[in-house]
Each structure stands twice: as structure tokens, then as C-alpha cells.
Amino acid sequence: NTLERFKYVFSTGAYIDSLTLAGSVKNSFKSESVENIKLLLYRLDSSYTDSAVYNRKPDYVTSTLDSSNYEFSNLRKGDYLLVALNDARSDYIFNPKTDEIGFFKDTISLPRDSIIKSELSIFKEELPYIFRRGKEIRKGQLIFGYQGKPSNLKVETLSVVPDNFQTIILPEKGKDTLNLWHSPIEKDSLIFKISNNNIIDTITVALRKKQLDSLTVTEITGGVLNIKDTLFFSTNNPIIKIDTSRINFVHTDSINISYEAFISKKESTVGFIFEKKFKTSYKLNLYPDALVDIFETSNDTINSQFRTRSLEDYGEISLSIQNPEMVPVIIQLTDINDATVAQETSSENKIISFKYLIPKKYKIRIIYDTNNNGKWDTGNYLQKKQAEPVEYFPDIQEVRPNWELNEVIKI
């Protein structure tokens, strides 16, 4: 049988050290509790440097095990650095590529500090930009992989190409990858310059694929379009031309709908903006040649039918933001898994209303936007920079049809 939380203590001197240190750990951004976090104590003596977490084991180790609380025991009197580590390799060494880290900003002095009242927040650092590689994944489509978050990533074709040669570059959602589609060309390879500010890489990508993929178009709505959403169709190849004369868009009474079609600059999608009505059915027919992709191939006939919900099918959350100190905050509405549904920024007392919500459970996340850049920023250990503070409103918001919830948020 497993002997849990077993301790075996011995001393190489005349007595056993008896000081303790306790506290708790949380995720800096997500609401879920953390488990099995390593807590590391480094003695601040003449041999200590800030790089210690990267290259040597700590002086003391403990773990939260199956909770978010930790406790060190049998500690020696002195000054320490306290670090929390979500240690992917269980080697007690900080690897920024795989590990989350948290640190207590002040020196721990024992026996004065025995209980850390503020929670340690662990975060994943933003890695420095490094270009990885480029390769062809299908004829006419290349991918460029990189590490980190580039601030000004550009791709330039260096090979000699015809005047009508086109490229379309789109980021891959959720990945450190750029997709590049190019016009068909009879070459064995293409040379590109990849630049991010003053970091420049030159690469050659071999072209070996023989068959172009035909254009496929997929409706994203799933048959029901939320009243505040845009109608999108995703495509496997990026679209370069929309012929509205090959599109028929009507609602239930077969009355033509005025709309604006556009090509997304962020994803391989085509969008349709129109005045939506509650509890209405729509038909959208895309006839051949309505959409033309970068390879000059077009769609087959697509018959799409979808509807909108009635006004009574939606709920609403109204938040009274009490912010007397005028602190810049981002108020986010999330689903039960912490994915952002909607957000508003505020640095004053105001009412924020999240309307037309699908009935289900939501959370309210408050980001203290200390640098006022409109987004959450993670921390950095070497810079001794903590992640921007995040709080979750304690109550889950259960939205019901045709109902408004009202809450007060005190900043």
C-alpha cells in the first residue's frame, strides 16, 4: 500500500531544523485549481544567482500533491527565494518551453515568515521568437513554424517568379504557424526571407507535391446563427474573388436579402453581413464560380439553410462596475471552461451588458490591465515580472431564456 505524505527526517549535525513555511498556489489565468505543483526554496547565500532555477536543484523541495496547498518543514533559519513550478519533466529545473513558474517577489526570511498569505500564481512565460522551419504540406501550400509571439512577422519571396504570382499568408489559429498559399508554379523550390523586426532568416522550401486540392466550402453555423454573429463559410484554400451574381440569398418569404460579402484577412473564411431578424429562416445558394480560390478553382453548388432564434430564447447579464480608483480592467464573460465569450474594457464606473446570450452557465473574469494595452500579459521570471492579476467573480452565472441577471462588480 502507498504510504502517503511520509516524511523521513535526519540531521548531519547536533540538532534537527524545525522551522516551517506554508501557503497555496493558483493558476495565474484559469479558474481551475492546480495540483502536483513543486515548491522550491533556494537559500540566498553567496553562491546564489538568478540563474539557479535553470541549472541547479533547490535546497528544499515540497509539493502540493492533490491540493493547491503546500508546507515546508524542518527548514533552517535564513533568507530564501520561493518558487512554484509546474514541472513537466520532474527534474526540479525550470524549462521555459514546457514548465509554468511562479515566484514570491520578496525574500523569505525565516523564522519571521512562516505563512505566505498571498497565493503564488504560476504562469507560462512568453518564449522569445525563433524561426523553426518551412515545408510544403500540399501542392500550393507551405507552412512556416516558429517559436514565441513575433511582433512584426513578414514573409518575402526571393525566388524569381512571374508577375502574376500570388501569395496569401494566414496564421494558423492556436499554433505558432503561418500558412502560405501560392499560385501554381513550375519550380523545384522557392526561396523566402522570413523577418521579424531585425531577426532575418532565409530558407529554401522544396516543392514536391503533384496534385492541387479542389476547393471545399463548409458552413460554420451548424444550422443556427446567433443574432449577434456573422455568417461564415470556411474554405480549405483561401478565396481571392467573390462573384455576387452567382449568389442567391433569401429569407422565408423568398424575398432577396441585401448583404455584404467579404474575404477574411485573419482566416480562410468568407463572411456575409446582413440585417438579421429574430426567429427567421434563411436560404443562401452559392452557385458554381461564386467563390474562386488562389488556384483559380471554384466551388460546386452549395445550398445552405439556417435560422435565427427568437428574442425570448436569449438571456442577458448586466454588470454594474464599481471602479472608484479608475483602474483599467478587462471584464470577460467566459464559458464554464474559461474560454472567452465576450469582453469589455473599463476604467470607470459603468454598466456593462452582455446581451443575446445562449442559455447556459457562464463565469465572469476580471483582468487588471496594469499596462493598459487591452489584453492579459503573462509574467517573466528573469525580469521579476508577475503575470497581470486575474480574478473570477465567485458566483457562476446561469443564464436562462428571456431572463436578465444583474451583478455588482467591485474593483
Regions found by a protein language model. Give the residues of each.
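N-terminal targeting or signal-anchor segments and their processing/structural boundaries
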Residues: N1-I411
